[in-house]
């Protein structure tokens, strides 16, 4: 029996098949869900507009006044969630409209947000869908290969992926049934980091640093730099900038806390 949050998401997009299409997974996989998997909450929220607090109230409760919410970790989680959503699939027209309203401060990261807003305003969903295909899928392969194993070994499904699966298993984070992408895919790693940074996956304190240092820092910054400079990147150029800057900020922050 589906929980209310999953039912609301299905209604919001017009049915199970449409939600499966938007997520890029098989319809039977979603039909087997009782609730939205933890690692899919951010993506489903982005695609449907249904709040994460509705999708998974057990993970995303409304904070009470006087709570000990860490604003920095919340901001980190939001940045990772944004990157995860944009790397998982091309943004819809509705998401582009919301992105066009982004604002930023005079910091490099803030200016990258402004650049993303401008890029979102200057394109269409159809154009970005083609750009996404050319960059990450392609005929045979895309311009970029957004996988940790590929960046670290030159091949897919190598030892870096196995080590990541071991560490995720220790944290109780399991691969979603029907998801064809390996866990070392850039979007999946960003979604996992969003959940860890926001304390939403039930992992022990410091788990975000462990995953970052072992599985994110060795390659994801290089991927974002490549995306920033990719020949086919127009909308995705500022996405690469945001990712590269976030990787630098994270590495520096974890080093200071060591």
What residue ranges belong to the model's regions?
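Recognition helix of helix-turn-helix/homeodomain-like DNA-binding domains
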Residues: 22-37
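Short amphipathic helical patch at the helix-1/turn junction of helix-turn-helix
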Residues: 10-11, 35
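Short, charged recognition helix plus adjacent turn
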Residues: 1-9, 17, 21, 39-46, ...
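Short, charged early-sequence alpha-helical segments and their helix-coil boundaries
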Residues: 45-59, 112-123
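Surface/interface-facing alpha-helical segments and adjacent flexible terminal/loop regions used
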Residues: 67-258
